Design a protein with these regions (language model features):
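Tryptophan-centric aromatic hotspots in well-structured domains and transmembrane helices
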Residues: 31, 61-68, 89, 148
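Short secondary-structure capping/junction motifs at helix and strand boundaries
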Residues: 35-45
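Metal- or metallocofactor-binding catalytic centers and their adjacent structured scaffolds
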Residues: 1-37
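N-terminal small/glycine-rich loop or linker at the start of catalytic domains
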Residues: 43-72, 107, 116, 169
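Residues within well-ordered alpha helices
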Residues: 32-36, 83, 140
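Catalytic domains of carbohydrate-active enzymes, especially glycoside hydrolases
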Residues: 80-95
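Catalytic core of soluble alpha/beta enzymes
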Residues: 94-196
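Active-site mouth loops of central-metabolism enzymes
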Residues: 57-78, 96, 125-130, 173
Length: 196
């Protein structure tokens, strides 16, 4: 905390761009150094600092894939998903928005045939949708039991997310491209985020 206070002293609010990347890089280096000095794995040190000292040995991970590779087609996509399952993943995330809505729905349905119907598929638009497109996708995605609908629009477009939450009742994930506490706080306050 002291290092953050020093690095952010006299800084204006916000956290975009080079400053947040530089501070984040220094922050990671400091944690790595402290871990080495303490002769403890970083996960243990963080658990002691911010938890009860007993790190959770089970960490949720998912496989991210389902990109729009040239010549892949539906068979290639389902083969890719099967490989993730063979590696032990139970949840898979695939991209959407790189094809038409109808084509994306075909791809989703093909993946769901491999994964099964029980919320094991997340989809990620990488922030590319305007409000109308995000809602059009939401209406169609509501037909599937998805793990989440990720980054439908720009994460700083709080109005888009707030309105979208009125049209999509499943879990919505966003915020990985926010770089400040203020942005994360405003996302929670103004973007219609729900606890799910």
């Amino acid at each position: 905390k002291k290092m953050w206070d020093i690095m952010m002293k006299n800084e204006k609010p916000g956290g975009h761009g080079e400053r947040s990347v530089a501070v984040g890089t220094i922050d990671m280096a400091i944690w790595d150094l402290v871990s080495k000095i303490e002769e403890k794995p970083l996960y243990q040190l963080l658990s002691e600092q911010y938890g009860n000292g007993n790190p959770n040995r089970d960490v949720f991970v998912y496989a991210a894939g389902g990109y729009y590779w040239p010549e892949q087609g539906i068979v290639g996509l389902t083969d890719e998903i099967k490989k993730y399952l063979d590696l032990g993943y139970s949840v898979v995330k695939k991209k959407i928005g790189g094809a038409s809505l109808a084509e994306d729905c075909k791809r989703i349905e093909a993946v769901l045939k491999v994964l099964g119907p029980n919320d094991r598929l997340a989809v990620d638009a990488n922030g590319r949708f305007d409000l109308k497109t995000a809602i059009d996708y939401a209406k169609n995605l509501s037909n599937y039991n998805l793990f989440w609908y990720e980054e439908p629009g720009d994460p700083l477009d709080f109005e888009l997310h707030k309105e979208l939450s009125n049209h999509y009742l499943g879990p919505i994930a966003t915020g990985e491209n926010l770089f400040s506490m203020q942005d994360a706080r405003n996302l929670i306050r103004y973007a219609g985020m729900r606890k799910d």
